[in-house]
Amino acid sequence: MDKEMTVNGKSYTIIKLLGKGKGGYSYLAESGNNRYVLKQIHHEPCDYYQFGNKLEAEIRDYKKLKEIGIKMPAMLEADVKNERILKEFIDGDTIYQLVLEDKMKNDYIEQLHRMCALLYVANTNIDYFPTNFVVHNEEIYYVDFECNDYMEEWNFENWGVKYWSKTPEFLQYVKEHS
């Protein structure tokens, strides 16, 4: 890919696209010997989600989740003009990849339940989809910063858990996105 992008005037080499979400494109980027995630906010329509200012929401949500105590990458910089965020890169497989490869461990779900205990007390849900979680040194990290007010129908037990094993919902998603 070898493209350059800047964050607050500093240049980063884009290595590859990591993924596209509701709010932006996340790239693996490097500068010197360090690797980062560089997220470029996009303004593509999303038929199932309403946004305000996406960059402001990312910053606000990051601060909220950090205060709650959620294990996640550090937000290193926010470039308001270019609508970009620079995050710490957490190296590891996503929960999605581990489910696909039959490498899931009960401990990862137990860790998520501990995360949920912190979130629910704070009246908060996160996006429990398995692509948003990376395992590094046997610990799960929430690598998205999105959070919302708690709604029972969207909590882990009622929605997220459907995608943390090879359920019909998970397999349907794989079929539609392969």
What is each PLM-predicted segment?
Residues 14-17, 22-55:
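ATP-binding glycine-rich loop module of kinase domains
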Residues 1-15:
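Juxta-kinase regulatory segment immediately upstream of eukaryotic protein kinase catalytic domains
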Residues 111-118:
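Conserved hydrophobic core/spine positions of the Hanks-type protein kinase catalytic domain
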Residues 128-133:
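Hydrophobic residue at the +6 position relative to the catalytic HRD Asp in the kinase catalytic loop
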Residues 50-68:
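The N-lobe alphaC helix and its flanking beta3-alphaC-beta4 segment of protein kinase-like domains
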